Amino acid sequence: MNTVVIVDCLRTPMGRSKGGAFRHQRAEDLSAHLMKGILARNPQVNPKEIEDIYWGCVQQTLEQGFNVARNAALLAGLPIEIGAVTVNRLCGSSMQALHDAARAIMVGDAEICLVGGVEHMGHVPMTHGVDFHPGLSKNVAKAAGMMGLTAEMLGKLHGISRQQQDEFAARSHARAHAATLEGRFKNEILPTEGHAADGTLFTLDYDEVIRPETTVAGLAELRPVFDPANGTVTAGTSSALSDGASAMLVMSEQKAKALGLTIRARIKAMAVAGCDPSIMGYGPVPATHKALKRAGLTMQDMDVVELNEAFAAQSLPCAKDLGLLDMMDDKVNLNGGAIALGHPLGCSGTRISTTLINLMEAKDAKYGLATMCIGLGQGIATIFERP
């Protein structure tokens, strides 16, 4: 089978969903901007050679409906011969898009694919139009459909304290802010047009979601938001609401070499797994174990890890059971995570993979893991290898 490689990866800045810079930009705009941008950065690639576009998106309605991948490709002016499909595995959608593209390349059905994802949570809220089947309650706790309550449950089962959650959240903002100041996001962010508070157009080249002023003491003053009486999960220890898109240029290693492109990473292994929906945030653990087994590697072999921060109460149990708690400052979410940057659902899979690849390059790392939990009880994981 063909070896699948990443030759480039990009993302928009993360915009605040409430009155943020992208409030007048649509999901298709963000997506098309990245599609054009990643091809402009790689002029050796003839767009007509792209077989398919795989684009993750969760709320596929309103501006994100009717196959947003195809809409964005047409908006970007890409050749009409390129196919496009919108992929939905909830929070893992764009990572699933990467897996789908990788398999097409592995078996020879494609040589080049454009991969990514988008979510404009300001325009299309996460709960818009959600209508669970009443019969689900026979098999699944009703609270399993409320992500914050699943985080509360997972945190309680693993003895995660409020203090630990506040410290983890403060770390996320501090690391993301430091990464911004030190220019560590510069290579992965494609400056994107947005609107300032007064409505004037400007180019955003930083993540406006990060709150540099965040402290443990400040977080400790917030009230639990999902279980006000007995809970520990607050808005401050949950992933921020943000708007954004991410993209990757994926191809066979043979094609990359023929085009003279630098191979930034290879896909070493991929996996998905299910878990109890009531503790949906635990999904990264079984998914990671599967991926490691398929790669013939161990957790110790992973030099850098991106664990999507849906909630602090969810991330910490996963880090604990993956044996990462003692390695956090050396390996895990070194540039912060979704608590600081936000979790635009369909965008996050390729967003964390993009951040991971840039970190691997900065640290001259061999192996990296990107993994995330998925609503209703799933996990997804990808292991990358640098050449």
Curated annotation (Swiss-Prot):
It is an enzyme of class 2 (transferase). Its main location: cytoplasm. The active site is at 91 (acyl-thioester intermediate), 343 (proton acceptor), 373 (proton acceptor). GO terms for molecular function: acetyl-CoA C-acyltransferase activity. Its EC number is 2.3.1.16. This is 3-ketoacyl-CoA thiolase. The lineage of its organism: Bacteria, Pseudomonadati, Pseudomonadota, Gammaproteobacteria, Vibrionales. Heterotetramer of two alpha chains (FadB) and two beta chains (FadA). CDD domains: thiolase (cd00751). One of its GO terms (cellular component) is cytoplasm. Pathway: Lipid metabolism; fatty acid beta-oxidation. It comes from Vibrio cholerae serotype O1 (strain ATCC 39541 / Classical Ogawa 395 / O395). PROSITE patterns: THIOLASE_1, THIOLASE_2, THIOLASE_3. Catalyzes the final step of fatty acid oxidation in which acetyl-CoA is released and the CoA ester of a fatty acid two carbons shorter is formed. InterPro entries: FadA, Thiolase, Thiolase-like, Thiolase-like_sf_Thiolase, Thiolase_acyl_enz_int_AS, Thiolase_AS, Thiolase_C, Thiolase_CS. PANTHER family: 3-KETOACYL-COA THIOLASE FADA, 3-KETOACYL-COA THIOLASE, PEROXISOMAL. It holds the Pfam family Thiolase_N.
